[in-house]
Amino acid sequence: MSDMERTAVIVGAARLPTGRFLGGLSPLKAPELGARAIAGVVERSGVAPADIQDVIMGNVVQAGVGQAPARQAAIGAGLPAEIPAMTINKVCGSGLKAVMLSAQAIRAGDLQVAVAGGMESMSNAPYLVQGYRGGVKFGDRSMVDALIHDGLWCSFGRCHMGGHAEYTAWKADVSREDQDQFAYESHMKAVAAIDAGEFSAEIIPVEIAGRKGTTVVDT
């Protein structure tokens, strides 16, 4: 097989709107969000679902989402049940690692067509009560926030991941003022791009059914 035949290419790409914590997308768990993303990108790409050979999806905070999140997303998207699926947890790099693994498999000749991406719902991260399975014999027992414990807390440094970011900024001599200015400019560019409709082609609108009707989240 030639190098050209082993080249991995992206034939379709799409994303859901960017949500906020406890915002408009919060009624949907990560696999439900993933299902909508997969269904949308498959439709836009023109790839026949039966031609897809694997689904690889990144997902960090998996507590409470149910067994096999990537497979839930694939089935929820209407893909054939025969297609295997794998969930990847590489913290913030989970979704991109899923894409990398798919590309590696294609270059190796193991796959021809794959769906890859990431899905997350920080709003749906549960609170955990540890130690109750064996029973609490004496004293208090606190709840553990899975969002922090599984997603934002360094297992090795025993600190918030934001602390590592501050340390990295300090080592690179990036001031707080520089960070704030960069963040401000980034937000302003995003607002301008949204207003100009620059993101419309890549976003899959999400419909949320509620007591007051259906809400469409599209930015």
Outline where the language-model segments fall.
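Condensing-enzyme catalytic core mediating Claisen C-C bond formation in acyl metabolism
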Residues: 2-30, 40, 170
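Short acidic, glycine/serine/threonine-rich loops at helix termini
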Residues: 21-23, 67-68, 124-130
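Flexible glycine-/small-residue-enriched beta->alpha junction loops
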Residues: 113-167
